Amino acid sequence: MNAVLNKRPTIERLYESVRHYADGKKGIVYAISIGHARNIASYYSKHGMNAVAIDSKTPALRRKQFVEDFKQGRIQILVNVDVFSEGFDCPDIEFVQMARPTLSLAKYLQQVGRGLRKSKGKEYCMLIDNVGLYRMFGLPIANRDWQAMFEGRLAARVIPIASKQDTIVLPET
């Protein structure tokens, strides 16, 4: 999957989605690998967005400084690989970009949930879903019949929220 997603044309498409829908906004991006996260952050930064990558190899002090700078508005975009899936609280996040697939509903809801925190003056959070997870899981705020899901039946209705040109088509595995 990394070989498909971590290519310049794909990263350009990710960037164009953010530029089109969330230019100048504060957000968090979920990448599939350390290299993918670093390439996204580098590309975004080269094109005028203040972005940094944080991953398991980022030294603790540097990670802490990046998070503080993000919370204070000195960094616009955090690109990460499973670092901020849960337990990260920054209510003024304005967009979440899904640049990686997952088969886990729990992971999807946790990651998108980083942007769903209430914040003074915040009316909404944009979900930029470049990998089409909404097709599998529905909107993160959808009412869910959890019992039906546990029994193996999908209960969520799917509502498209990104245009076709913004979605990266992944090859069949």
Residue ranges and their predicted role:
Residues R8-E12, A60, K64, V81, ...:
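Amphipathic alpha-helical transducer elements in NTP-driven molecular machines
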Residues H47-N50, P91-F95, G121-M126:
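Short glycine-/polar-rich loops that comprise or flank the Walker A/P-loop
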Residues I28, H36-E86:
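Conserved helicase ATPase core of P-loop NTP-dependent helicases/translocases
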Residues P101-Q110, R114-D145:
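Conserved segment of the helicase C-terminal RecA-like domain
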Residues A148-T173:
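Cys/His-rich short segments
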Residues L78-Q97, G113-R117:
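SF2 helicase motor core recognition
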Residues Y43, F66-D69, D92, K107-R114, ...:
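Alpha-helical scaffold elements adjacent to nucleotide-binding pockets in ATP/GTP-utilizing enzyme cores
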Residues M1-S33, W146-G152, V158:
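Conserved interdomain linker/interface between the two RecA-like ATPase lobes of SF2 helicase motors
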